[in-house]
Amino acid sequence: MQTQLGENDISLPQYYNNRELSWLDFNYRVLQEAYDKNNPLLEKLNFISIFSSNLDEFFMVRVAGLKDQVKMGYDKPENKAQMTPQEQVDAIQEKAKKYVDTQYERYNELMIELKDYEIVMCEPHELSEPLLSKLERDFKLTILPTLTPLGIDAYHPFPKLNNKSLNIFVDIDTEDAINSAIVQIPSLIPRFLTYNEGAKQYVVMVEDVITYFINYLFTGYEVLNTFTFRITRNADLTIHEDGAEDLLIEIERFLKERKSGSAVRLEVDGRTENPDDLDWLIETLEVDKQDVYFLNGPLDLTFIFGLVDHLSHKLNYLTYEKYSPQIPRSLGNNNLYELALKRDIFFHHPYESFEPIVDFIREAADDPNTIAIKQTLYRVSKDSPIIKSLKEAAEKGKQVTVLVELKARFDEENNVHWARMLEDAGCHVIYGMTHLKTHSKIALVVKRIGGELTSFVHLGTGNYNDKTAKLYTDMGIITTNEQIAEDAINFFNYLSGYSVKPEYNKLIVAPFDIRDVFIDRIDKEISSHLQHGNGKIMMKMNSLTDKAIIEKLFEASQAGVKIQLIIRGICCLKPGIPGISENIEVVSIVGRLLEHSRIYYFHNNGDERIYLSSADVMTRNMIKRVEILFPVEDKEIGKRLVDFMDLQLSDNQKGRYQDEHGHYHYVENNLSPLNSQVYLMQEAIKYGQELKKRSAQPSGMPVVSKRRANWMNRIRRSLKK
């Protein structure tokens, strides 16, 4: 359907989802995975844990920021759904509590299912006498010495309780008066203890153990009442970059300050029976009653990560079947550097191994012909092999320049450590850009080959993190394209010095140009569609919040352009609204792997324009971050990207479509089941097996591939079965 442009006001709030509420809906889609009958039991539990971990960060950052606005009296509505900060806080609390109640309901159901496998979550009093004796002995030896009861009276003010710490509130009868104390549970002691008896394994939470033996801490007094609570604090504090002589020192100050930010959420054991104690705690922490969450189970369900890890040794059949990333199809058994001199090499992680990217830096560090290595780092693993190679390269006299983004949220401490280590090794380390986060993923290796300098460039959508590369779906390209190489050199010169914004040949860089290029490409697609009637836009990203681009997508929809958006997380655009967005569809895929790649496709009357990027279509990515959008010009790689998006749009197992009201629904059709992530794993394994067969063939013998059939044709045939 085509609508007259400008017929409707595309800025009206009813056409938009609020950013924060849309994020909560995404996190609920994560929780839905704990209900999926196709997921193994321990993986269902993991999704319960991921939901909690996500929600913690959401409160520490997003809710904290809104509450700061409310305290300052700021009541200006946000620019899409037109909700004031207070309206957002109220709506968040209502929706979050509903989802948390669902989470705990599901948690308790899964704990019952665990009993079928002889795993029993229990409290100390439910243990047999022999096990209770063991528990008491373990408490005295390994837990009691670590505990410090903190009295609360005129001589003992309310203690500073760390963010996300677990605490026990205690009322004690001291004969003269009823006093209170707090016992903070150290984060370094195990969250649960396990005991075997017969075929069963019993799991006891450490807070229940401490509560059961609480009298050991208050000898001579009667303990009247206890309850467990947990505080979430504001972690969205300001890093004062202006005037900071050393950003490393400023970041370290910020990290200390973040541990004791104002409280934004109070979680309490739902069995709490003393309302006076709770009221006193609410008043002391200066939280509102709507900030209090009564939970029907253990506080902080992120402990499940450790529990699943513990149980998976015995119950590995209740986890996903192990998957090993395969050799990249674009690389095969070729030497990476030799092949890159001939053509671009494409990588799709974690279906395809991240190891070649690690080798890209490792081999550059080892090669005496390498002159320079330059790289941006946003999040890396704790024992990063890439960091190791960069250090070794510098120690061997190579010119190594590394931008380590110190402001990468919740990775600041890790990145400060790496920055210091790289500097000590002789690397030139850049801490980032003032008032901007450098989120781009780029590495440049300069080698002397045949007497000339040749530049190899890796551009990607995800972090240089060998651990998360096994869980996050990301894409990247290694190229020796001379124009991109020149752009990469100019990009690093811009980061490392005081040069003005460079003019790039092919790279498109935020905060300067990405938004403008997107708007220009959408405008061109509108014009092309009005002339040829075949306009089409496909975009895959993590989140869509930028209003200028949303409005432009609305215009394209009104012009009749077909728009397909694959958005895992936040989506402020409502699709399917007559006269506004009826030509837009939005699908979210949440599954075993975290969808993280960003792809942008414009049909352009058959002269397709395809890009990969580190950037989502969020306002922060457009104006507050250094991002790279780069073109995919290799036709074979471009076809793989289009086929991939078609595949994801056909996913009827993990795909959820958003309706015109902003609600998400599982895809329901009569086609054969298709889980796009599982399909890609299977395809990667098939290619790996075929590659091994080829390698085993005697030299000189012809190899006939059985994979000539078009990829998407095979998918379509399978869906018709």
Curated annotation (Swiss-Prot):
It comes from the Bacteria. Residues 434-468 form the PLD phosphodiesterase domain. Its cofactor is Mg(2+). Its EC number is 2.7.4.1. Mg(2+) binds at residues 379, 409. It holds the Pfam family PP_kinase. One of its GO terms (biological process) is polyphosphate biosynthetic process. GO terms for molecular function: ATP binding; metal ion binding; polyphosphate kinase activity. ATP binds at residues 54, 472, 568, 596. Coiled coil: none annotated. It catalyses: [phosphate](n) + ATP = [phosphate](n+1) + ADP. Keywords: ATP-binding, Kinase, Magnesium, Metal-binding, Nucleotide-binding, Phosphoprotein, Transferase. An intermediate of this reaction is the autophosphorylated ppk in which a phosphate is covalently linked to a histidine residue through a N-P bond. GO terms for cellular component: polyphosphate kinase complex. The keyword ATP-binding applies. The active site is at residue 439. HAMAP family: Polyphosphate_kinase (MF_00347). Catalyzes the reversible transfer of the terminal phosphate of ATP to form a long-chain polyphosphate (polyP). Belongs to the polyphosphate kinase 1 (PPK1) family. This is Polyphosphate kinase. It comes from Staphylococcus haemolyticus (strain JCSC1435).
